Amino acid sequence: MAVRRRSALLLAGAVAVPVVGIGGYVAYSGSTYSQGWRMGQLFKLSNRRSWQRLFMAAGEGELSLGQDSSRAAWAGADGQSVQNPWLFSASVEQIAQYEPLLGRSVAVRYHQLQKKLTAFHGDTDYRIDEIVPVGAGRPPVGACAVSGRGARSSGTRIGRIVKSTVKGTLAKTHECTVQVGNSGNVFLEMSVPNEAMHDCVTASLLSGQPVAISYVENIIRNPLNRDTNYEIVGIRPVES
């Protein structure tokens, strides 16, 4: 299922130039390391000041990934620390705009800054672009598949997709995170082979529903192309 493309802003110094977004996301040339969606329960939004920004507040938020997960931290496939809940920064105006969504299951579209400007612009290097309720008014997720190559094992997992991202500087990779099962703190990182499957992964995330994810485990992995040995080759809806 194709995700709707939208226009974006190209940040060049202090000048914003409209361009076509990459994979449906806002693109900031030279300033963005990753961009994508995360799904879960929105349970905190706040405005706060620090000694670096005494005269202006910055918005901060927390998203508990998936359904009924708890506080945890672990090392991701790329070696970076992953935290649940996921912390993000926003403008004061965005905090007010999205406050009615507190306590609901939502999808957050974000971009991650290449260079941290946390001292004056927020506590994190993640900036939100929009927050939407999951599932509301969206068509059911359809089945999608690609062929897998070089596999030494294969299988299917049932779970919710809680993260869909495009990341990297010169070489871009498509990655996702799956909450295995119906709830809890078991998260599995997987790589996405192409943009068509990435669109399907993102559509599954926006639905908020569990899906059956078919994958192969590749013997050889090019780290420039993907973060994990697990490659998604098919997604289909789970009958309730």
Feature-to-residue mapping (PLM):
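Short nucleic-acid-contacting surface segments enriched for D/E, G, S/T with interspersed K/R
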Residues: 82-83, 89-109, 195-213
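OB-fold (S1/OB) nucleic-acid-binding surfaces
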Residues: 52-84, 171-190
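Core hydrophobic alpha-helical transmembrane segments of single-pass membrane proteins
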Residues: 13-21
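Structural detector for short beta-strands of small beta-barrel domains
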Residues: 34-55, 152-174
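Short boundary/loop segments of OB/S1/cold-shock single-stranded nucleic-acid-binding domains
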Residues: 22-34, 138-153
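OB-fold/S1-family single-stranded nucleic acid-binding modules
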Residues: 113-142, 218-240
